[in-house]
């Protein structure tokens, strides 16, 4: 078993990087790959950079050159579900682009030409995420649709657009749909496990900066437990 783990920012991968033994570092395509062992399992940790293009580039290199059996996407997200608070966890059931629109050609809003409308997370990986969550005392989690776009969602207008077109959305962020699409095209199972750094309708940019470390801690803890369960 080899596990690919993807985070966008240095802050989102730092805890995981510190937990990897016999680590080696490779820089390629503007991305950084850390290989080694985590809980006795072979892992490749990708720090992709922010946004969908950076994530797609990094994930494609990860999948083609390192050939992981599964991919876990970690990091922070903005909460849309009313029950979510800072530091809570979201587990993807599916992932969609919220900033794609080729409806003029008969596709659904958020669906790219030639691609499914939604990228479904792997059932087994979702179950492992649930098992990991059960090991985390008093940690609240929501399962559902995660939406991705190349924008930090902090305006009422954009929030309203996303809620209108994706009413079941539980969280938004800036990389997961690109990662999911790459995994779909390479036929590699994936799941997204992120923690909430800011909540819609609140002071999102301010809370993001303040609570990113909390989100990184929560999501990294989940991933470490998942890796142990996948051993």
UniProtKB/Swiss-Prot annotation:
Pathway: Amino-acid biosynthesis; L-methionine biosynthesis via salvage pathway; S-methyl-5-thio-alpha-D-ribose 1-phosphate from S-methyl-5'-thioadenosine (hydrolase route): step 1/2. It catalyses: S-adenosyl-L-homocysteine + H2O = S-(5-deoxy-D-ribos-5-yl)-L-homocysteine + adenine; S-methyl-5'-thioadenosine + H2O = 5-(methylsulfanyl)-D-ribose + adenine; 5'-deoxyadenosine + H2O = 5-deoxy-D-ribose + adenine. Substrate binds at residues 78, 153, 174-175. GO terms for molecular function: adenosylhomocysteine nucleosidase activity; methylthioadenosine nucleosidase activity. One of its GO terms (cellular component) is cytosol. The keyword Amino-acid biosynthesis applies. Catalyzes the irreversible cleavage of the glycosidic bond in both 5'-methylthioadenosine (MTA) and S-adenosylhomocysteine (SAH/AdoHcy) to adenine and the corresponding thioribose, 5'-methylthioribose and S-ribosylhomocysteine, respectively. Also cleaves 5'-deoxyadenosine, a toxic by-product of radical S-adenosylmethionine (SAM) enzymes, into 5-deoxyribose and adenine. NCBIfam families: MTA_SAH-Nsdase, PRK05584.1. This is 5'-methylthioadenosine/S-adenosylhomocysteine nucleosidase. The gene is mtnN.
